[in-house]
Amino acid sequence: MSNEFTHLNLWERTRAGIGVSFALFWIGILIVAACLAPFLANTAPLFIIKNNIWFFPAFELLKFVDILFIILLVNISIFYFFRSKINKLFSWLVLSVSGLLLFLAYIFINPLQLINYAKYRSLEYNSGIQFKIAAPIQFSPTDYLRDYGNTSLEAPLDQPTSDLQINIKSKDRIHLFGTDENGADVLSRMIHASRIALTIGIIATSIAMLIGIVIGGLMGYFSSWLDILGMRLVEIFESIPTLFLLLTFVAFFGRNLYIMMVIIGITSWSGYARYTRAEFLKLRKMEYVQAAIVSGIPLRSILFRHMLPNGVAPLLVAMSFGVASAILAEATLSFLGLGLVDAPSWGQMLNQAVNSATFNWWMALFPGGAIFFTVFTYTLLGEAFRDAIDPQILHKNN
C-alpha cells in the first residue's frame, strides 16, 4: 500500500496540478541562480587570454560555499537526468566523489580577503588582452563601484550623471535592476541572495520535519501516556515566539545563519508532530499495520516505511508553508536590520526601499517580488503534492 502513493505515477499526477509548471520553473531558476551565482554575476572575467596565456580571474574569488553549490547542482543534474539508470553503487560513488571534492575544497581554497574590483574592470582596456569572456552581469554583489564615484541608489537603466562617472575610462555601465544605497548592483545581489532563501527554507524545514515526524509518529503509534507527554511538549514549543527568540540570539551570539536555521527548525516542528500524530492514530488500526506487527517487522520499518508514506499528504502541505515561513522569518530579520551584514539578502534590500527620504520603488519591487513568488511557488507545490497523494482525490478523478 505504501508503494501506491510513493511510486505510482506520483510525479505525473503532481505535474498535472494547477500552477505547478510555473512553480517548478521559478524554483528551477532559483536553484540555477544560487548554484551558478559566481558565474552569472561577477566583476572578474570568467576567462581571458593575455599575451597568449590563459587566465581564469573569476576562479580566484571562489569560496568554499561556491564549490558546495556547484557540486550540489551537478549532483541534482546527475540524479535527475540519469534517474532511470542509477543504481545503489553508482549513487554511493557519486556521493563519495562529491564528499572528497568538498573536503579538498575546504582544505585548499583560500579566497582573497580584500578584493580590488577596479583591477578587474581595468582589464578591458589592457592592451595585452586578446580575448575575454565576462559574466552576464559584470558586477559582484560586494562591488560598490568606488572607482565610479558616488553611485548610491540609482534607478534601473539610469545613465551616469557625475563628472567622475562620465569621464572614467570605462564603457557606460548598465544596471538592469538599479543599485542599492552602497552602489552595489541590485540584480547581482538578488542572484546571490537566492542562496540564503533556498538554504534557510529547506534546511530549517528539514530540521522541523525530522523532529516532528519522529515525535508525532511515536505519539500516534503508542498513544497512552506517551501521547499525553508529547502533546504537552508540543504545546510548550507552540508557545515560544520564534521571531523574539531569533532577536534574542542575534543580540547575544551575533548574526549567524546556521543559528537562525536551527532556531527556526526546533521551534517549528510542533505542526508536523500534530499532523503525523493524527495520521498515525488512524493508520495504526489498519489491517496492513496489524499484519506488519504480527509479522515481527521492526518498529522503525513499521513507522517510517509502511505508515509514514500513507500519512504524508498533510505533511507536504505543511512543508510548503514551513519553507515559506522560514524564508519570511529571515527576510523579516534582515528587513529589521538584524540579518547577515555582508551576505546579500532580499529582506535587507527591501529595507532600503524606505530607508531614505524618498521611496525607492526598484528596491521594493524586485526583492519584494522575489520573496512573494518564492513563497507562492512553495505553496503551489504543496497543494499539488497533496492532491497527487490523496486517495480520495484519486478515486474521484478515476
Residue ranges and their predicted role:
Residues 179-398:
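Alpha-helical transmembrane segments of integral membrane proteins
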Residues 1-209, 213, 353-368, 372-377, ...:
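Gly/Trp-centered helix-boundary motif
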